[in-house]
Amino acid sequence: MIIEERKNHELNLESIDRDLRMENVRQSAEKLGWEHFARSVRRNLLEKRQTLDARTRLDVLGSLVFMKEHLPIDNDATIARKVQQLSEGLGEHCVFSTQNSGFSIRNPDVTIDIGVAEDQISTCKIGYFGQPLTDAPGALALMKNGEFSKLRDSITAILSSLPKEITLSEKNACKEAFRALDQLLIRDAADSSFTAINTGKYGFYAPRNELRSGRIYYVAEPVLIRLAEKEGKTKADASYLDLLPYIEISFFKHDKPSKLPVFTQTGEWSTFNDANVCICVRFNQGFLLSQQTIRKLSHIVPKSPLVRNYVNFYRYMTGRVGVKSNLKLLTQFPDEGDIQQQYQVDSKMLTKEDDVVAMEMYLSDFRDLSKLIETLRSEWKHASLWESILAICESSKGEQKEVNAVDMQLVLRRTEFFLQFDTDYGSMTMQIFEKSPSNYVVKTTSQITGESPSLDFDKMLTEKLNSTWSIPATLTFAITDLKCRINSVLNCVISFDSSSSSDKQHQNYWSISNNNTQLMQSAAQKSAAKCTKKKVTVLEVGPAIEPTQLVYTRENDEEFQGSLLSSFGEVDDYYVKTSTIGRTRPQPRPKREPNQLTSMDMMSAELDKSRHTMEGSMRDAQTSSFLDAARVRMKQSIGAAHAVGLASHQPPASPVAAAAAAPGGPMRHNSYPSGFEPPPSVAPYDFPADPSKKQRKQRAKKQPGEEPPAGRGKGGKKGRGAGAVGAAAAGGRKSAGGAGENPFGMDPMRPPMLQRSSSEQHNPNPHQMSQYQMQQYQQNQQFRMHQMQQQQQQQFQMQSPKNPLVPAYTDEDSDEECDPPPPPKPQVSTSSRMSSVPSHPPPPPQQLGNPMVGYPGMPLQSPNHLPLTPSPLSAPPKPFSPEQQHHFGMKMRETSYWKELERLETKPDVEKLKQQLSSSSSSSQAEASDPPSTSTEAQDPPKPSSSSAPPPPKKKLGLEAAISKIRGQQEQALQKQLQQQESVESELATPHPGSSGAPPLAPHQVNRARNLNDIFDDEADDSSPTADIKPSLQALQKPTDTSSQSTSSEPPPKKEPADEQPEREKEKLILKIPKMLKPVVDDRREDRKERDRDRDRDRDRDEDREKVRDKEDKAQREKDKKEKERERRRQRDRDRTEQKKSDREKEPSKKRKLEKKDEKEKDRREPERKKGKSDGKEYSKASTTSLIPTLSLKNFRIPKKDTVEEEKKDVKEEAPGPSSSTESKKEPPSAAPITRKESTTAPVAPAVQQQQQRKESFTALPSLPEQQQHHREPLLKKKPPLQPPPPPQMTGPPIGIYPGPPAPGNLPGSSRPSGNRKQPLPPPPPMIRGPPPDQMYRDRSGGGGGSMRGGFPPASHYHGGTSGVNKQVASYAQGLPPGMGPPVVKPHGNNYQASQWVRPPTHRDSSHSYHGMPSLGPPQLQREPPAPPPPQMIPLPKDPPVLREHPREHRAHRGGADDDGPDSPEEGTLRIDDE
């Protein structure tokens, strides 16, 4: 917008409005003085409704204080007002007062008295840091001249030497240190001569006066010394001191203490104070420090110096910081006959920029001050020697002529200058090195003899160098005596040969004027600039600059004076190479809306650099091998696995066919011809050959004999989010290549956008979707069969019809983890597709296991992306290795699991699940070898073979356990049906299975069940701490067969060999795909480390909770003890009263007491008497008795060690009957979860029976303790009249028989004595008897692994191979009857694998923890759905007998390392907090 500029300001409304506004501001400023400024700022903020947080408010207040301290003092105000403003500027703690003779300013650090006579300031006295007042003539002169602002700034600078943040004691220590330092420096650094400044220990110290701090002058240049000597001065006066560099000492707050000396009259530093400050050495101007010097001072400095900028030491002093190579210098001696010196500087020391320009340095001890001054002198002299070369090589003359010069090669180092030149005696070298700090020595050496020509000559050169501090002046004495070879050169002083600029070389010259370094352009360049009148203005500074059109000079370029372009002396060669002028491209497409992948734009910066080098490398890569082409791509920021995938492609058949195969972009509808097409012409590259042209992305095509690419991605791990999903699913989109289009301006290596859910699909037609899924499965099946034919025999040995863990086609081998989706072909009919693969029929059209049909977080793209986007890899790649599959699947499945829980809200019908469950259980009885029944195959849409088997141990959520069982049975039935169809009708298409009367589950319910099956595959595998010891496949089959027998409702009939033969024949026709192996050793080691960390964290948490619980127990014990004491007192009083009665009344009272005790004991023994009855009655009665708790659940007892031996005898006397062992193997076939409402009517006998059996077959210690049957009973050691009744008949398998997996060799330490809780217990081997008492309520679920996350039992040992995910607690912990808990499962004797172990308790009283705490307890009790056996909640006597008979014996158990029993009856209880 152009605003008209009016000449007549009277009629310009804008000017009038501006004047009115300014006048309003002036009037407001007059009304608001400084004292009301803070109030007006606050009112202004409130009017604008802006509220400030506490931190911002402090910043505002600090800003106001700073402004108040630095506002200029009004010169027109009165003297009193000026002094008042002076006091306000010295800080908020200043007190201003008016006296008869003048004014007084009091501050904790300064005191100022100002005398006034006849309205004029007559005297001024100032005292700093508690010292007495002294006259301040400098301050008086400033006040008389009206320079109050300058006086305030000077006083503030002195006061700032002490930080305001330190405490009062630290401030006093700093003041003492200042006094001690002043005393030392005044004594040892009082000589102001130039010699003392350069050689003294501390140089020269100028003490502090009223206007400045003390200063230490440490170096003086010889040039300045010669000027003073010409004036007849040998000492530095005030005029010369202002020209010398100096340092000032102050203090700075630090987090570590420093040693500060204490002032004494003798001046000796014998005592020191510690204060959290460091000594700040402030330079008067920036000091150039090399990296070597900083390292040398690192052991005496407490923190790094305050750096203004990082530079290169030698380039910074030249004034031409852009020069990094080919630096040539020529001296400019004034006389015509003088021989010049031409230096060719080595470029090694010109590249790095690790030197600094420091403003402040810090010390931690005042005694290191002398060493710092010595180092600063040495650094200054080294810089002065290099500056002597630069200064003499400047010239103000513009003409060029030939001069005589000696060529010298100069190598720069921090400790020396190394010169090499030719003489008549051969090549000579000269070393100018620092023998001691600030003391340089010259040494010449002949290259022929290796010795110095003359030692006296070297001594003379050394004296000249130390007196002049000039290398060129010293070399003038050596050139004549050494007879150096002289060459004729042009007198261009400094020449920069820019090898990257091919047009011209920029020659610049140095000029010397008043010893100030100024860079001037050469006369030739000036004349060239005058001839060129054209000036180009560019909007984009950088790559858009065209160097041939931009020619200007600094001095006569008025248009660009002060602009950004004026800072460029010439165009950098980088901009010449990267310029895009003349090579413009069409505008890119607009990008999509930003999402969480927007940060991936940074990746395109590196890949954009490779586009300019693609034209030549593309042609070379087509002729080179494909591995070399992949290596080229690896250099262009591509992962190694990606490059290997690129290299696996074969040469294209014809570029024309490849170009014709890409009719549309990635977001268009495409029709795909049948069959596999060859890859495009430029397979290994992502960018087009010509960057100015855009090409459509071509799809990868497969030739008949071509192997698919080996892998994609990086390192076998996927990232997070939908970008990683796209990278896993469509990794071939980049690796298959084609001249890739860059749609929406995105980088080709960036993951695709987030996919939408299936509900947002563009074409949700079910018929088209099912047709597309069928075609997709046909393609997958085609190449999968072709690849796996050679592995059939090997995989046949790994499979068995009785082994549900190793199906013919597992979910882990499906496309969900590693295979990209093949392109959709909706226009092609099924019959035409089947004609190309006649021998392998496709599956049914509705494939619920298809990776493209699912939820948004699946490890592949959503269906929304599939019908629209072509897959660049029509030829599916080679399957990943098992290790890659494991890493690719683990994290994506966890992410998708939680996304699925949030998305799905529909719950399946319980009645429908029961119907399907009953049908599946009836079919399992008909077919003994195959649990799933073919009659249930029509109750749900058919599933692919990819999800036909129960996965490894997983966790389930509530009702999803039943869904997962139904899914597993139906998928196994479908797999069997597919095997029969493939063997009989191999030439025909797979028929659609008929539908039965039962309505099928909804697709989202089936998907949910299948997804929940797939969630924790890898987690369960990784949960074992001994994952490097893997059981063989045959070892896994045995426990599976045992578990299948125990889960059936009746003993399954044996299958005849004649029936097994057809099944084996069918298996030969089944395509075998290897099951995913366990992760490699490194991955297992990382998993073990992670599990150890989790275990340690949970152990710490348990210990904390144990401490809190111990405190609560202690308080409870104290309370109980007091209550018992009160009861004893009351009893004692009653006894005394009764003794006064007659003997006739005393006898009946004793009888009543005995009867009362007997009745209580009888109630306590009642569960044991009831257990002696029949099986069905005993469990119902036990459950009935458990419903009448009379005491708190805190008082449940845990058996102690000393009762184990006598219980061994009782258990041996009573052997279980055959009916109990047979009955223990029976389980209800239904796996549907029973709700609490339904569980009230369900029979509870199987639940308690299984819980009793779990007691027998849980861990590996020798005996079953008796007190598990009545653990509420107090531990009575010597009480023969009250013998407990014989224990009830044990149910379940015979004691000692463990039907788990056979691997006794992997179970060390399983036969330890009972009660040892300090070492982890591995899973029990067979033929080992009962659990220890402390493990009964700890790892009740058989903890599938050692990690705290994987403490649930393997899912394959539950009903239908499922498990629950709900964090359920035992029914007695929830305050419910035993039958109203989670569904009952079979005993845990079959729940172990050879490589699993049970986590031991982490504390001797660990049984008190985590009951009823679903958020803090260990996962073994949080996640397991099976409920442990409820403790017998029988009322205890009010006053239980105290165990006092064997106190020593009881105390002995507490000290042992292997003891796990409680310390007291109160500690031996099972704590269950009902929350």
From Swiss-Prot:
Bias-annotated ranges (Polar residues): 755-766, 1181-1193, 1308-1317
Signal peptide: none
Coiled-coil segments on the chain, per record: 1098-1135
DNA-binding in keyword set: no
Keywords, alphabetical: Activator, Coiled coil, Nucleus, Transcription, Transcription regulation
Biased composition (Basic and acidic residues): 1052-1070, 1080-1148, 1155-1180, 1199-1215
UniProt subcellular location: Nucleus
Main location: nucleus
Regions of compositional bias (Acidic residues) in chain numbering: 810-819
Segments for region (Disordered): 579-600, 645-894, 908-1475
Biased composition (Low complexity): 655-666, 767-800, 829-838, 915-929, 969-989, 1037-1049, 1242-1252
GO (cellular component) term, any one: nucleus
Task performed by this protein: Component of the Mediator complex, a coactivator involved in the regulated transcription of nearly all RNA polymerase II-dependent genes. Mediator functions as a bridge to convey information from gene-specific regulatory proteins to the basal RNA polymerase II transcription machinery. Mediator is recruited to promoters by direct interactions with regulatory proteins and serves as a scaffold for the assembly of a functional preinitiation complex with RNA polymerase II and the general transcription factors.
Assembly, per entry: Component of the Mediator complex.
The family this protein is said to belong to: Belongs to the Mediator complex subunit 1 family.
Protein name: Mediator of RNA polymerase II transcription subunit 1.1
